[in-house]
């Protein structure tokens, strides 16, 4: 499937690698032509509305303020590797600021997701891997008439995410705290038009969830 066909598909399922690929592709189009020589109205609009990062929405300020607060928090947190629903649960200790640096999507990537949801007016969004909820907040604010269902396997991380939802006063988000392999089969009856994979990053798990949901 070409990237244009993918962007036109009614259901979009992507991970951070694909977000980078889309961004690179649109930048390439802009560099080799310039946006005024692009004949496809859709591609022109995508470059104008998705790639153009000069427009900063008011919701970005609140989300990035929460990020800045998280980056200052040095409290330890015990993490459990529950993403794939593994029976052999691995535990590790980190801190909230390190978790924010390592697991959260960078602002520029999360803002591309925001612009995609806003541009295509997606209304039923599924996020696999809530983490600290910053990317979720971007998805939520992109279309406040829509609904974001987000899954987080780790109970302590899920608790932190819920606090951030409350801080940002997000009303259109449903947070589910369950291992992915347990909950995703229960969600198959729902019709999602935008799916973001940002949880278990193993190839096998990602492909399994992709084929289940798409």
Q: Which functions belong to the PLM regions below?
A:
Residues 2-194, 200-214:
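A short alpha-helical cap/connector motif
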């Amino acid at each position: 499937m070409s990237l244009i066909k993918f962007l036109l598909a009614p259901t979009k399922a992507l991970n951070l690698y694909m977000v980078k690929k889309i961004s690179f592709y649109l930048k390439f189009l802009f560099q080799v032509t310039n946006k005024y020589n692009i004949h496809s109205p859709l591609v022109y609009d995508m470059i104008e509305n998705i790639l153009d990062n000069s427009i900063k929405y008011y919701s970005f300020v609140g989300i990035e303020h929460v990020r800045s607060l998280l980056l200052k928090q040095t409290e330890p947190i015990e993490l459990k590797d529950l993403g794939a629903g593994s029976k052999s649960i691995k535990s590790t200790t980190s801190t909230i600021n390190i978790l924010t640096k390592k697991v959260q999507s960078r602002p520029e990537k999360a803002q591309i997701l925001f612009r995609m949801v806003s541009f295509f007016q997606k209304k039923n969004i599924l996020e696999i891997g809530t983490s600290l909820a910053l990317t979720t907040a971007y998805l939520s604010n992109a279309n406040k008439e829509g609904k974001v269902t987000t899954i987080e396997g780790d109970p302590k991380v899920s608790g932190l995410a819920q606090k951030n939802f409350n801080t940002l006063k997000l009303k259109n988000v449903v947070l589910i705290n369950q291992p992915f392999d347990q909950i995703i089969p229960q969600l198959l009856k729902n019709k999602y038009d935008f799916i973001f994979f940002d949880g278990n990053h193993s190839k096998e798990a990602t492909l399994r969830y992709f084929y289940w949901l798409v």
